[in-house]
Structure formats: C-alpha cells, structure tokens
Design a protein with these regions (language model features):
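Conserved beta-strand-loop surface patch within small alpha/beta domains used
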Residues: 1-100, 110-169
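Histidine-centered divalent metal-coordination motifs
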Residues: 104-108
Length: 169
C-alpha cells in the first residue's frame, strides 16, 4: 500500500487545531496530488450549532445526539460546514489539487474509526465516485493522551478499514 506524505508543519497544525477545539471534534480536508499533501483546509464542525443536520448518523446515534446540547454533540461527532467544503473544493480545482485526506479529531477516544466514521466514509464512497473524486485517506487525531497525541491514517472502503502509513517531509 502506498504511503501518504504530509509536511511536518501541516501535521503540527492538525494537532494544534485539535487541541484548540477540544473537547469538541475538529475536522477538515487535506489536498495535494498522488498521496502527497500540500494544502490544509480547516472546516468548521457545525454539529454544535442549533438545528445542525444530524440525520446522516445511525438511528442509535441520532437518539443519543438529540438528548445532548449542541456543544456536547460536538464532543463526540462532526459535520463539516457545506459552504466551507464547497470553497475548499473550488480552491482545489483552481490549483489542480485533489482531495487526499478527510480528517477529524477524537478528543477523548483512540485514533481509530468509530462505527459512525466507517458508515459515513462508506456513504461518501458513492458520492465520491459520482463526482469523480480521488479516494481519500481518513486521518484521526486522538487527544486521549493530551501529552502524546496519536495520528493514524486509514482507507475505508466498502465498510472495511485498513491502516495507511504516512511519512513527514
């Protein structure tokens, strides 16, 4: 499996962003070409806003999320702001970049995809294919141990998860 290459500064920025957002989840996109990341797009996690769309979660999670305040929701889930995502994709097209990574943080849990993460990634597959987007890597930043954040990258296809190695430049 081909490894992902990420500039050290972008990785440091992801950790800093996750720490600033904690206890809420942060999220965003990384772009580049051929598994080489060159650009970072921080996207607002709107799940904490009143009236945020939570219908894309499974029924059990929706039931749980509905009992929480918007701020509490953002501690265990994320929904990217559609307008900001659209602007990021427009910038990618203008600069001949492809989506390489979809990232988010787990402020209090390990750096591995949750069942909701797997379901959302699997749902995104059909959209990605229609839009002719590159297959993204999913990166999770864990702050479970604040002193030593853990970042792991994964391919999620057809509900199956495989770890993707990454290198820093």
């Amino acid at each position: 499996m081909q490894s992902l290459t990420i500039p050290k500064q972008i990785l440091e920025d992801l950790v800093a962003e996750a720490r600033r957002a904690a206890p809420q989840e942060c999220c965003g996109l990384l772009a580049g070409q051929k598994m080489h990341v060159t650009r970072h797009y921080k996207i607002t996690n709107i799940v904490a806003t009143e009236g945020a769309e939570i219908a894309n979660f499974d029924v059990a999670k929706i039931s749980h999320l509905q009992r929480l305040t918007p701020v509490e929701r953002a501690e265990i889930a994320f929904v990217m702001d559609a307008r900001e995502m659209s602007m990021a994709f427009k910038d990618m097209r203008a600069n001949a970049l492809d989506l390489q990574v979809i990232y988010h943080s787990h402020p209090q849990s390990p750096s591995r995809p949750s069942l909701t993460d797997i379901r959302n990634a699997t749902d995104f597959e059909s959209v990605r294919k229609v839009l002719n987007l590159a297959e993204p890597v999913h990166m999770i930043i864990s702050l479970e141990n604040q002193a030593a954040p853990v970042l792991n990258a994964f391919r999620i296809a057809e509900g199956k998860v495989s770890q993707v190695p990454y290198n820093l430049t």
